[in-house]
Amino acid sequence: MDGSCDCIEPLWQADDLLVKYQYISDFFIALAYFSIPLELIYFVKKSAFFPYRWVLIQFGAFIVLCGATHLINLWTFAIYTKTIAVVLTVAKAATAVVSCITALMLVHIIPDLLNVKLRERFLKDKADELDREMGIIRTQEETGRHVHMLTHEIRSTLDRHTILRTTLVELGRTLVLAECALWMPTRSGSALQLSHTIYNSAAIGSVVPINLPIVSKVFNSNRVVKIPHTSPLASITADKSRYVPPEVVAIRVPLLHLTNFQINDWPELSAKSFAVMVLMLPPDSAREWRPHERELVEVVADQVAVALSHAAILEESMRARDLLMEQNIALDAARREAEMAICARNDFLAVMNHEMRTPMRAIVSLSSLLLETNLSAEQRLMVETILKSSDLLATLTNDVLDVSKLENGSLELEIAPFNLHSTFTDVVNLIKPVAACKRLSVMVTLAPELPLHAIGDQKRLMQIILNVAGNSIKFTKEGHVSITASMARPDALRGPHEPDYHPVVSDGFFYLAVQVKDTGCGISPQDMPHTFRKFAHPENAGKWNSGSGLGLALSRRFVSLMEGNIWLESEGVGKGCTAMFFVKLGMPEKPNANLRRMAPHPLQPNQGAGGPDALSISIMDSNPRVPRVRYQSSV
């Protein structure tokens, strides 16, 4: 070896086999070290969000230096110069520095990398949870779709049996069931009867006692209840399982407001009755009931209950409609019969009206002719009384016979000025013969403030007073009858039993108050509500005091037309009776000054009854058994 060469000899010979392997290994190590930084550079370029770029730069420098060290080491397997040794030393020193710095930086980076791993796991868990939630959402959507479909099918009809059949078929198709059945309560309510199935129709009619523990368990829960496949409720099909028995669930179906639910003599069901729906999965399938399937069954059971209640309401409506049609037909027939009866009655009344008016006109004509002759004062008074009675009888005949006019409310008042005091005088002249026959005293008292003239219907007013006073005389055997007339005070216009009567006091009008008091048989509290009814007779009236029973009823109608009020008061049987009525009359603007105002005075029953030359007259009561009262003239 040349002494002038500053070279370093290797530790092994160049042709040594180990040296060759090391040479080759260093070459490939250097090649790998130089390729790794290129891959890191490509990764950093593609990853725009990588947070540790400077760390990768340090790794790249470390790897490049390591590769350079191995590459320089290739020249050390042969004789090499000292320059190569210096370069190798510098490369190793730089590699040591960079590797130490990188190692120190990893102390701070590794915890962050661990956190990244934890976050990755957390995100995976969240992703799994989201997947589960999405599965639940998809399941709910599927359940909702099936429920919507089933609801549409159920509500497409309001026939109960169609609803139940459709429900079972659609549930069996949607849930892929081996069998689905419905148990309904029997007529006695002590058992459940199988009414509907999908496949095994031969089992329909089977009966299960309602007091079984499994039935009570289903009734006491509004959720799906799992029942054994050996339960009597599950005996809806033959057991064909060879390995795994089928899972069976049951749920109650409220029968809401069902009546007359007839199938195989089913009873009338109340709102607390329940049916039981049983659902069976296919056997040997190892399939279990999932939560969304249970939820679907619960929702469908509620929808079936609502649909059944709607169907029941429709059936009740149809039955009510049919009943109403039958009643309308019956009412129409009754209306036609009533119209025929009314026509016949009107014809009869028209004939009777004509036949009664003929003799009445003769009486009026003869009485008018008698007034034109020379009569005494007493005779003239009697003939005038006959004329007034005939006129009043004509009015009564018009009212009683023209029933249709009274019933349809077409009766109208004849408003005209009249002498109010003379009206009471005429009433006394009409009732005093009957009172004299029964030896009753009649007292008439007119208040000083009572006007002489008034405006109203004199005939109706006179008829009211005659009906009330005549009624008092009729039911009084002994004693007296008093008639008092005055102007009513506004606070006294409402009777004790008429809270809805509201009189209206206005200028130009006044209310006439008339009180008729007797000492007769009185009225019992039981008969008081019936006194103003047509053809009503008190039980204590007796057979001699029975009239037509129209007087008070007509009087009440006339008082109502005159915007008044009428009522009776009695302390009981045998204690007399007091009749009070108010009528609204007009006040004349210019009363006749030539007429003298009548002062209140008592009238005796025999006043004007006739003197020794009185004309023979007769006053007839409505009862034909009452004897006639005659006043004979002297011969």
From Swiss-Prot:
GO terms for cellular component: endoplasmic reticulum; endoplasmic reticulum membrane. Its cofactor is Cu cation. It is a multi-pass membrane protein. InterPro entries: GAF, GAF-like_dom_sf, HATPase_C_sf, His_kinase_dom, HisK_dim/P_dom, HisK_dim/P_sf, Sig_transdc_His_kin-like_C. One of its GO terms (molecular function) is phosphorelay sensor kinase activity. Pfam families: ETR1_N, GAF, HATPase_c, HisKA. PROSITE patterns: HIS_KIN (PS50109). It catalyses: ATP + protein L-histidine = ADP + protein N-phospho-L-histidine. One of its GO terms (biological process) is negative regulation of ethylene-activated signaling pathway. Disruption phenotype: Chlorina phenotype. Enhanced ethylene sensitivity. Binds 1 copper ion per dimer. The chain crosses the membrane at residues 24-44, 59-79, 94-114. SUPFAM superfamilies: ATPase domain of HSP90 chaperone/DNA topoisomerase II/histidine kinase, GAF domain-like, Homodimeric domain of signal transducing histidine kinase. Its EC number is 2.7.13.3. It is found in: Endoplasmic reticulum membrane. Ethylene receptor related to bacterial two-component regulators. Acts as a negative regulator of ethylene signaling. May play a role in the regulation of flowering by up-regulating GI (GIGANTEA) and RCN1 and regulate starch accumulation by down-regulating the alpha-amylase AMY3D. Homodimer. Belongs to the ethylene receptor family. This is Probable ethylene response sensor 2. It comes from Oryza sativa subsp. japonica (Rice). The gene is ERS2.
